[in-house]
Curated annotation (Swiss-Prot):
Superkingdom classification of source: Bacteria
Database matches in PROSITE patterns: HTH_HARE
Organism: Lactiplantibacillus plantarum (strain ATCC BAA-793 / NCIMB 8826 / WCFS1)
Disordered: region residues: 116-199
Protein name: Probable DNA-directed RNA polymerase subunit delta
Length: 199
């Protein structure tokens, strides 16, 4: 295989990525990784041992280099062949082919599985026999409890708030009696004294 763009250059100075790019450009179609590696090896004249040593780095460089694109199934092509919008379509299209081969599962509805067996089926549209029960007796009991609760509150209605106010005005002579009351005039005097000292 001859690559015209490398005429006059030493093959030992060429990188595997440069050669792979030139091979894909000349080939014009996607290639499997193994075929691409074999083509690079045959062009550079490298031994199997030398290629095996550099194989992992070559694969990493293919992934990192922005000019290559993996199309799935270890097929590689040049990114320049695919416009930006069609990249996802080209990559995803191979997955769609595999999905068509698989038979689709049938959906099972758990409620309709045994439609012929009516013993276990609950019909929620039927009237419930408890709906016909008379609940008027329960309403009478609620009325009685309301009357007893209101009678408890009636006892509190006679309590007057004025009795508490008188008790609050007369304080026992404890700690409160020992406190002195401050007047506004006393506060002003303290501030005036501080102002005089700072001058």
């Amino acid at each position: 295989m001859e690559l015209k763009q490398f005429d006059g250059q030493k093959k030992s100075e060429l990188s595997l990525i440069e050669v792979a790019h030139a091979i894909l450009s000349q080939h014009g179609d996607v290639m499997a990784f193994a075929d691409l590696t074999n083509a690079v090896q045959s062009y550079l004249g490298k031994s199997d041992e030398e290629i095996r040593e550099r194989l992992s780095q070559f694969y990493t460089d293919l992934n990192i280099d922005g000019s290559f694109i993996s199309l799935g199934d270890n097929m590689w092509g040049l990114r320049a062949w695919y416009p930006f919008e069609s990249i996802d379509e080209a990559v995803i299209h191979t997955d769609d082919d595999e999905d068509e081969d698989r038979p689709k599962r049938k959906k099972v509805n758990a409620f309709l599985a045994d439609a012929g067996d009516d013993d276990d089926v609950i019909d929620y549209d039927d009237d419930d026999p408890e709906d016909d029960d008379n609940y008027d007796d329960d309403d009478d009991q609620d009325d009685d409890t309301d009357d007893s609760a209101s009678s408890k509150y009636d006892e509190l209605a006679g309590v007057d708030d004025t009795d508490d106010d008188v008790a609050d005005e007369t304080l026992p002579d404890g700690i409160e009696g020992q406190l002195s009351e401050l007047n506004d005039d006393d506060d002003d005097d303290d501030y005036d004294d501080e102002d005089d000292e700072s001058k």
